[in-house]
């Protein structure tokens, strides 16, 4: 029935969202976050999801309480919280931490399954039992707690499966849901923490939820603050037991529950848990007892208050974000329903004594100042008083809106905000006003600079405010605007508060961004350091587990020894009783002696037979003696052979000594040769070194000579070329003069000869350049000039001239050209 009712509550929450948006929400209700989660008192098996309200910024606290739309404001505020939580889950550092935690949880469950499979269970049985059982949060070794819980579930079988056990579809769903539940649990006990901070605490504490509540990341107060808190805490100590209205809080022994693992939302059962009831109440009233602790010698108090009944709709087919959103929607619907007048039902509280201290009671010498950047959680100042009219214990004279723990006679505990306590007590008493005593750290935080925890809680409230601003960006909607004056005219105190707070939105958003960047950087650095130190931490934990295992084995051995001693005593008693029985038996044996005599006669007959067998054995012995004599002859032969072998051994030993002497001589000679070789090698190295130096000098000299020779060769080549050019010019000049002389003589003779013979006169453009009478017929290659006749070409070639007379180019080939003469 509880599953169906919770599903209907969530569906009802989704249907009433449109109605909630139609109402005007007061700024006081907007300032509140993480409202207390309530449970239906008509459901006996359902437990509440108790949550402490975070600390608000002083500047954002409204002065007047508008109670007209209280329940509607709470629902709207929870919708804003849903969006804020989805934003926190989308943070990249949150995703990185989520991957690390998921991998650690998955490894933890796989190790559990491996151990259980080694015990003889099948894979299906182990997977079903692990996915059905909830994670234990007590003790130091989380793996052993899960193994013990799963073993108990496997032993009980289907009979042990209650209504609170649900089977997941696969192991990954179990890991995802377990991670979300652990983070939600930490945020319920520590409401000032964000999702990233809760993940970081789980990672630092190796998935131990109890250690995450009291993580060292909170920082420790300094010695001066400790002395102030002790002096202030002394004022809030409970009065003496003689006061009938203020009985002593219940005393519990934390050692009695140390070895007992705890489930989510459960406390160990102690006999002192019933001492919180008051004897002066009527049967019609439920008497509430306040369970609190003074501030002497301790820094803070943690309550592990969780819901034992999980949201079933989140069990299957949901991601972590959907689980968190559905969880918030369920809480919104509960607040909307129970604000109309239904009662409160708190989480089951069996014994809160051992968890009030949470191992935080330490001597003042152990408190060391921590880094100022660590977040300091607000201490809970305590004082126990009995409100006779209301029938419950509450803390009085509190200046801040710190949570109040109320415990009724049935053992249920509820964490109420200060305002809820005031309003509830006013309704019951009619005139008596209940106030709360602030703790030492709260008084100091009012008069000093705001601590890091206040900044952190302020940054969270600013983040929530920024998310709500994205949902409703028009802050002035519904406020009348005066066009003449150019200002908004507030109609009530709510509008005045809106007009005052809207200008601060940008500043708060900038401050939120700065804090977010700083926190992300610190998370990244701390994650890197944790990943570096994680192997060493695991090794230390393993050593601690081995030491604990050794102690357990030693204790088991002592128990076994005691058992053996008791068994030996028991055996000794049995031996004495058996001795008495033996005396009684002796008489009976005398009666049986006669029977034995008869048997002895039969034995004599057997002795005769044995004598015969002895004779046969004697004959075999004689034969053996004969064999021994023959073996003695063989022994003598073997001894002679052994003597000869020994002589050979002595000869060989002499040869060995000679060989050793020769070896020593050879070794001495070898040693001398080695020394000589060392000297020669040293001389050779010196010679090599000298040769290398000489070679280097020779190379340098050779390079110098080569350079000088190259410069001389270049100089001589240039002179040769210059002289060759001069020689060629002189040859050309001599050839030219010779040719001119030849021209003069031959031209006249040829001209006269042509005239006498009647030959045609050669054209001027076809005349030879040397004789000026014959036709050009020789072609020079490669310049292709045709300037000489055949005879002049022969003369030109005989004189050794290789330059063309026209272009002065080198002649490689001479070709005689023949032309057809026209008739």
From Swiss-Prot:
Mark out the compositionally biased spans (Basic and acidic residues): 453-464
Instruction: Mention one GO biological process in which this protein takes part, according to its record.
Output: protein ubiquitination
Start and end residues, zinc fingers (RING-type) = 768-808
Gene name of the record: RF4
Its protein name is Putative E3 ubiquitin-protein ligase RF4
Q: Where is the composition biased (Low complexity)?
A: 224-240
Keyword Iron in record: no
Identify the EC number(s): 2.3.2.27
Secretion signal span: none
């Amino acid at each position: 029935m509880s599953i169906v009712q919770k599903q209907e509550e969530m569906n009802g929450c989704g249907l009433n969202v449109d109605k909630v948006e139609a109402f005007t929400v007061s700024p006081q209700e907007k300032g509140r976050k993480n409202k207390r989660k309530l449970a239906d008192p008509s459901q006996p098996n359902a437990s509440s999801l108790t949550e402490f309200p975070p600390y608000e910024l002083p500047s954002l606290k409204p002065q007047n309480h508008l109670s007209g739309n209280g329940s509607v404001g709470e629902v709207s505020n929870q919708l804003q919280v849903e969006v804020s939580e989805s934003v926190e889950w989308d943070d990249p550092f949150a995703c990185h931490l989520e991957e690390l935690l998921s991998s650690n949880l998955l490894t933890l469950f796989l190790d559990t399954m491996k151990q259980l499979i080694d015990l003889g269970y099948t894979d299906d049985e182990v997977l079903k039992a692990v996915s059905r059982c909830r994670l234990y949060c007590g003790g130091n070794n989380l793996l052993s707690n899960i193994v013990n819980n799963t073993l108990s579930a496997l032993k009980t079988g289907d009979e042990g499966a209650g209504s609170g056990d649900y089977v997941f579809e696969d192991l990954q769903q179990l890991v995802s849901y377990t991670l979300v539940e652990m983070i939600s649990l930490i945020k319920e006990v520590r409401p000032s923490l964000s999702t990233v901070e809760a993940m970081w605490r789980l990672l630092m504490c190796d998935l131990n939820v109890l250690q995450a509540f009291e993580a060292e990341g909170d920082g420790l107060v300094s010695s001066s603050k400790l002395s102030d808190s002790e002096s202030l805490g002394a004022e809030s100590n409970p009065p003496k037991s003689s006061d009938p209205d203020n009985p002593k809080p219940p005393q519990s022994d934390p050692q009695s529950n140390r070895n007992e693992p705890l489930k989510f939302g459960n406390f160990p059962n102690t006999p002192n848990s019933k001492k919180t009831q008051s004897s002066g109440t009527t049967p019609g009233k439920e008497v509430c007892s306040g369970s609190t602790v003074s501030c002497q010698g301790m820094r803070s108090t943690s309550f592990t208050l969780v819901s034992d009944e999980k949201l079933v709709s989140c069990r299957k087919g949901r991601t972590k974000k959907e689980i968190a959103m559905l969880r918030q929607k369920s809480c919104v619907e509960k607040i909307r329903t129970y604000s109309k007048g239904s009662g409160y039902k708190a989480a089951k509280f069996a014994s809160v004594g051992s968890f009030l201290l949470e191992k935080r009671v330490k001597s003042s010498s152990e408190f060391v100042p921590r880094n100022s950047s660590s977040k300091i959680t607000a201490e809970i100042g305590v004082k126990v008083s009995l409100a006779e009219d209301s029938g419950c214990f509450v803390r009085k004279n509190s200046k801040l809106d710190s949570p109040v723990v109320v415990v009724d006679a049935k053992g249920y505990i509820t964490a109420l905000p200060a305002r809820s306590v005031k309003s509830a007590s006013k309704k019951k008493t009619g005139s008596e006003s209940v106030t709360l005593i602030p703790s030492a750290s709260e008084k100091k935080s009012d008069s000093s600079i705001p601590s890091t925890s206040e900044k952190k809680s302020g940054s969270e409230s600013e983040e929530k405010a920024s998310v709500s601003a994205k949902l409703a960006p028009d802050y002035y909607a519904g406020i009348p605007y005066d066009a003449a004056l150019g200002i908004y005219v507030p109609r009530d105190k709510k509008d005045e508060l809106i007009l005052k707070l809207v200008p601060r939105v940008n500043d708060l958003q900038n401050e939120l961004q700065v804090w977010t960047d700083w926190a992300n950087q610190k998370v990244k650095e701390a994650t890197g350091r944790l990943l570096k130190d994680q192997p060493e931490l695991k090794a230390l934990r393993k050593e601690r587990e081995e030491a604990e295992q050794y102690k357990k084995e030693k204790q088991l051995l002592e128990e076994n020894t005691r058992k053996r001693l008791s068994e030996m005593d028991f055996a000794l008693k049995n031996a004495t009783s058996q001795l008495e029985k033996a005396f009684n038996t002796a008489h009976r044996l005398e009666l049986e002696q006669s029977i034995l005599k008869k048997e002895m006669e039969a034995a004599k007959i057997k002795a005769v037979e044995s004598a015969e067998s002895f004779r046969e054995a004697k004959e075999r012995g004689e034969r053996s003696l004969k064999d021994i004599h023959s073996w003695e002859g063989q022994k003598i032969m073997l001894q002679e052979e052994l003597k000869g072998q020994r002589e050979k051994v002595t000869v060989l030993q002499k040869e060995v000594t000679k060989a050793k002497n020769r070896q020593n001589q050879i070794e001495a000679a070898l040693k001398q040769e080695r020394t000589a070789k060392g000297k020669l090698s040293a001389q050779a190295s010196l010679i090599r070194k000298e040769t290398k130096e000489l070679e280097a000098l020779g190379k340098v000299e050779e390079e110098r000579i080569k350079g000088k020779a190259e410069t001389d060769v270049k100089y001589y080549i240039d002179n040769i070329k210059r002289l060759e050019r001069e020689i060629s010019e002189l040859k050309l000049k001599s050839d030219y003069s010779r040719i001119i002389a030849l021209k003069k003589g031959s031209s006249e003779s040829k001209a006269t000869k042509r005239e006498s013979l009647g030959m045609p006169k050669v054209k001027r453009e076809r005349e030879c350049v040397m004789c000026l009478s014959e036709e050009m017929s020789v072609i020079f290659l490669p310049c292709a000039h045709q300037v000489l006749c055949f005879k002049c070409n022969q003369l030109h070639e005989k004189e050794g001239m290789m330059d063309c007379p026209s272009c002065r180019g080198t002649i490689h080939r001479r070709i005689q050209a023949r032309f057809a003469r026209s008739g």
